[in-house]
């Protein structure tokens, strides 16, 4: 599989500068993930496709560092960290997408402890085959003989494209065949492969870690979730990069495109479209949405760092809980909003936005996959209203809600009085939404499913409102200190405008969600299947 020629120099440059999967290193001297976040955002803004070649490798190194044996780490990690070898995540199969427990790939024991023979097929494997690295280390889910049904029976295996000898050198081809490359809507240049293992009955792999399945129970899903949790957070950044590029393309275009007269000067000259009211609304809709998502995602990266490195066990547990709650919002809310925000960037371009010569068209296509990767966004909303609402008897989620309440109650200022009042009303509505979900959990589970996505959006909007309003308070303080003539003045003015707009235009959607949930329309459930016509 050949990548675009331009990718090869970029990949080498990233590896030489150690700005790729090297940030996945978890040992002494590691770089905080929150420090890496803006780098990955900029990389994603430059190309949503090429970042996958090192980000998937980073995820694989995370699993091996946490669960691999010392021997496995010594064999694979050095060359994965240098970029000489790539890595992938092999979950999806033709018959096992969101229902991961339906995997049909098999692992058969050999006479060598820890070594298994693999047979099966994986599809939609990002970076599944390419020419940027000399070897690719696949982490494949499969089931051993006697495995339990569903996810409980899944184990995780290290399956290299080319065999790796015990001294870390590369051996012969390991019977992992690329049988197809997908022709995708977006992220062109990122190889999405269908892989067959063991077509010649000669594919082998190591089970990750030392424990074989006990009573048919594997720990592969637990191990893979270490990968997926990080990749879900990264996916939020990938989609944010697309939003960034689309917004700045729209901003640049509206500053030079001259069309129509101002509404306040109908006899005057035609003006740049950035001077028209609705274009300014679209731009601030994008800017505020982009900055809200950035605040949400960067906060989650900080939680992830502190979950590991905070001073006390109690603090580490707290930050781990906060990361767990934020993560589905980072992945799902961000990628849901990406389609809307990049769509607004297209609209700012008018007819030219529909042309492939202009950036927003490809950025829109690129970001669509982010709502599907790492568990579809409905699965993320299920996680949010299910596990995250109730984990540890609901104590962490209640604390999360209380922190937003406390902020709204304690940070009132004259300058932002209207925004704090709107946030207070929004929190009343959000808690009402949470209560309705709790009632449906005990009773009407179909209603809970119908409104899961909107509940997730409601939580994301109030949390982002809190984050942007806290930024606006700081921006107002700095602006008062530095004055309008300071070179950072417009930056701070932009922060204030983003917070005001977001709270008064994005957060207010919560009231519509609350109303719809109270009405409880079930027409989507009641409609006969035959009536979908």
Where are the regions a protein language model picked out?
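Amphipathic, small/basic residue-rich leader segments at the start of a protein or domain
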Residues: 1-55, 71, 75, 305, ...
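N-terminal glycine-rich flavin-associated loop
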Residues: 52-70, 97
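Flexible, glycine/threonine-enriched loop-and-boundary segments that flank and lead into catalytic domains
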Residues: 2-13, 19-24, 88-112, 117, ...
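A glycine-rich, basic-preceded beta-loop-alpha segment at the flavin cofactor/substrate interface
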Residues: 163-179, 184, 194-231, 251-274, ...
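C-terminal amphipathic alpha-helical interaction region
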Residues: 38, 391, 406-533
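A structural-propensity feature for long, helix-poor, extended segments
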Residues: 60, 69-72, 76, 81, ...
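Alpha-helix capping/hinge segments and adjacent helical runs
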Residues: 187, 299, 317, 321-402, ...
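A short core secondary-structure module
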Residues: 115-173
